[in-house]
Amino acid sequence: MKHLEIELKILLKKDEYNRLKDQFTGVTPVLQTNYYIDTPDFELREKKVAMRIRTFEDWAELTLKVPQSVGNMEYNQKLQLKDAENYLSKEELPQGLVLDELAKHGIQSKNWQVLGCLTTLRYEIKTAIGLMALDQSRYFDITDYELELEVENHEQGKQDFRQFLEKNQISYQKAPSKLVRFVKSMKNS
């Protein structure tokens, strides 16, 4: 499956996260783990694309993100959890949509490497302004907090997101993606 993901995000302080969590009452959090994948020579990063296997309690998904003028085109391939665990341990990828799309970008590696993992506890709720996700993520010795808003229209979404943040007394500052934060921390550890 493929779809255009237009997402706005902000890193939060722990107290901001705790305040916002009150707005997610009744929402059961989902634990998800992202395993970031690249070639040994970082061919994906060089081409500005990102790939991960994300595991949930009883299923998994292989995702390729390709930047567009606005947002990322996301290619998702659903996996059985046991198959995902097998691919991760062997550092192999399944045939299908993601490998086909990589080939279109001139990437036909058979050499994959799992860079590491980032685990997120996510509260997600559909709001009038878009799909909102409140995340607490752990990677290496870091815990960070993030608010994401997935929208249909970037400009309207930006306006709505800023109003939401203002109403909640949080100043907007664009946040790097989880992968960028993970890789930066990987270099520092």
Regions found by a protein language model. Name each.
Residues 1-189:
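Phosphate-end processing signature that detects enzymes handling 5′-triphosphorylated RNA
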